[in-house]
Amino acid sequence: MIQKQNLFSRIAGISTIVLCAVGGLLYVKKPVQSVPAKPAPAEIVQATEVRELPGQLDSIPLFNSNSPEWVKKEGILLSTFPPDAKKVPAAHLNFAFQGQFNLFAHHFSHTPLNLRTLYIGALLYNPSSAPVTVEVLQAASYLMEPDAPFKQKPALSESPNGEVYSGPGIRAVDNVLRGIRQPDFPEKLLIAPGETALLMNRPIPVRGLEKPINGCSTFVRLKSSGKVYAATLAMYAPQNADGGERAPTLEEWQQLLNNGGLAGPRDKTPTPPDGTLGSLIYGRVAGVQQGSGWEAELVDRDAKNLAIPQTGKVISYAISTLRGGTLGTQQVQAGKMLARYRDTAYEAHGNYGVHYNLIVPLHNTAQKPQTVAVSLETPLKEDRL
């Protein structure tokens, strides 16, 4: 019997079990053709048994701010505040958090007028008549430039200290998984009755970059002692009398929240769940999704362990499956939206920010030691195999 292994603390090295991230696990893999003049890439097919992933999403809500991804018009990115006394009531989803919840925000600034710095603000509001304490358990926020540019990386790299990443989202999530809270984030916020606190005031500068494009990814785990509402907003840096830029104040963020509309431009409108005509458009997520974690033991049916496959055989478990991409399992893992804007995604496709904690209790049924390889793959998105 091989001891149980947690895939997120140890990944062994020569394969017969395949675990695929970002859209699932499968056997088909096709590189993207980036230059039309080059020959079409080959389609690699590997025979494998694809299984439905056991378990389910937990009930911890996730504030998911990802639409619009490319911000050119300042405004409200995502607000779960009550719509009362707001100039644009439809921009506020009226969803309160209590206890543990997570916050994910991912937005870009692209060629802004006069290269002005775009700020992303995150607000928390206490609607009650008693103080509320919000603990910031872990938190990280990174810019694409210079913190975490997108770069091609080897298929497998050791990263004992979190030094391997490509893009700000990967680096932020890596920090949170390591239990890090960056110094820019407070250990806790004490919010007085009826008051609003500023959790984040993050600039996305583009001036001085070779291309005036930059982005920011933020991931935070929070725990509140009472009900709170949350919002993310985008605002171009206010200017001082001398023309220089400064960070927005809490009061300026509140004014935008109370009087502003949704930031723009808006992303593509998604295909309804019952839509059957035309291309399937997922849309981008802006809302509150149900579930921040997925725990499971990968075992054979009616068993307590997973028998090592015969030599040359492969077992795959699908991760982050979604509508139109269940990889033959008919299982949709995408988180349900508890609150969303009408022009944004119906489900949290891709499950960004969801922590998969998978245990594989392997059982060696042979009479000799066996070497098992565990790998994460990104296959072609298919619904049927």
Model-predicted segments: where are they?
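Terminal connector regions
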Residues: 206-249
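Extended non-catalytic domains of envelope/secretory-pathway proteins
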Residues: 35-45, 54, 59, 98-100, ...
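N-terminal, Lys/Arg-enriched amphipathic/low-complexity engagement segments
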Residues: 40-98
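Intrinsically disordered, low-complexity Pro/Gly/Ser/Thr-rich segments with frequent PxxP/GP/PP motifs
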Residues: 150-208
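N-terminal secretory signal peptides that target proteins for export/translocation
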Residues: 1-8
